[in-house]
Amino acid sequence: MTPELGYALTVGALVLALYGAGAAALGGLKGRPDLQASSERAAFGVWLLISACMLLLVYAFLSFDFSIRYVASNTNRGTPFYYRITALWGALEGSIILWAWMLSLYTLIMVGRYRRTQPQLYPWALAVMLGISAFFLLVMTIPAPPFERLSPIPADGRGLNPLLEDSGMITHPVALYLGFTGFTVPFAFAMAALIVGRTGDEWITITRRWTIVAWYFLSLGLLIGGWWSYHVLGWGGYWAWDPVENAAFMPWLTATAFLHSVMIQERRRMLKLWNLTLIILTFSLTLFGTFLTRSGIIGSVHAFTQGSIGIFFLVFLSLVMLGAFSLLAWRLERLRGQSELDSIFSRESAFLLNNLFLIAAAFTVFFGTVFPLLSEAVKGQKVSVGAPFFNLVNIPIFLALIFLMGVGPLIAWRRASAENLRRNFLMPVVIGVAGAALCRALGVGNLIVLCCMGLVAFVAATIALDFWRAARARRRTGDGWLDATWGLALRQNRRYGGFIVHLGILVVALGVAGSQAWSTQTEATINRGASVELAGYTIRFDDLQPVEESNHFKVVGTFTVSDRRGPYTVLTPAKKFYPQEQTPIAAVDYRLGFMEDLYLVLGDFARDGSHATIKVQINRMVSWLWIGGLILTLGAALAIVPEPRRTATRPRPEHAVVA
């Protein structure tokens, strides 16, 4: 009964989404408020029915309803309670439900926010949102039905992928999908602006905060994904340029470019065509990432199973891009800028260069990701493109972007004079050079690391200089330094939230540079009671013990770690053996530190526990990534908060940075 009810709810939601999209479009075309109201009720119905689907599937997981193929494939009677809930999005079909539900929720919020305030753009935006929802519901109905019946009904299920039994997988997909689906709102309003012909700043003003919200969640998803990779996969890294990692990173890059370039349109009425192109690319890349993840055409630790779903996504992506760029071509005459670039030494130029570098990074990531597929299609042989290619091409681009993070906020609009350049950048340049020189004096010989350290010092100095000047100006009104600084963050939160985001990126950059330059590792086979030494640590092998868990068996090693001062910690890495898996899963153990992490992986071992192979890593400055990511997300959250209404006439500094 449950499979049939779930399928009926899915079909009902699909019918409502199709009807709502048509009614909204017709209402916008004919100016019919009754059709618009009907489409709004349809949007609510879509959300209600998808919510019912989710609750029904959660109930099926909790009650071990193995008559549903998806439940039997992703849980068993030994799966812990909370992982039975998160198994909802642990594989292909459930992840599509989560996507569709989030999309319907965003649609509902959009209805409540704009149905009375945006009579021209809103109906068409609603039609686009419901049309996209209809596609995902179609996927749930035909190629990836979550309620497909399984017969005969097994006594127990296969179980969840062991790598997903982690707290990171509770939050990582949710944050990532909130980011992906969030970009649908600015895309929908951009399409509405093209359809109606209102190609000015209106759609950007409407969607600015929506874009920051989506960017915030996508950033959070990438951060949690890096943490999951670091502490679950057992290789000691946080970013492998895996195709699915790249698929989430590409829309982040184009969305970051969009968030910066819209400021030029707001300030100078330039880049209208460019901004529309960027939001189309960002939304299209979210679909492309979904296609990569779910089509099975690539090999990835994140990818789902193969099936006809890839064809559905590829066709839909093609239709979206064809329709969007056709609208763009139709309105081309209306998209000519009202201003021109006055000088290469200007804020507009800095932001434009920022955009070009971000798009160049997105293109290189895209090319490296799809090249194996192109090679296989043309030559019949798949060529592997790994981290060396991505690092070689992207490191210079990212260094240039760090430099522009320091230039953009302080250089003048239109044309910067020599005096403006001297006043704003002389001291930061001196600090940047001094920072690089200090690192060299401390023994840093890697040129890339030296450049990164110097650029980070330069950008940090520009941020501090801007804060100091603005706080000093506020002090003239009688505020203290603390009140002045706090007031800046609260009253101009979009600007200073962006600065905090930049500060977080600087800390992340330091973490990446430090971890790549100074980390070290060793691998050794040692007898019980023996030790291995690395970078001042002594790791002694004490014991191996078998442990029986509810859904797996594991062997836990005990290792006592000492440093130069004496006993430091005890680490207990393990090997997990799942009945449904061919190979064991490594469960790493680690001790996190501000400057370095001690990371231990248990390899092969003797059955009698007489000896074991271990990999020991000293990963330096990796914690800076998580600290920088936290700072970044806090800055983005600050930029999302609406600025308070001003009751005084105090001059407001111009916006320069956005998250």
Cite the ranges covered by each PLM segment.
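Solvent-exposed, non-transmembrane regions of integral membrane proteins
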Residues: 1-659
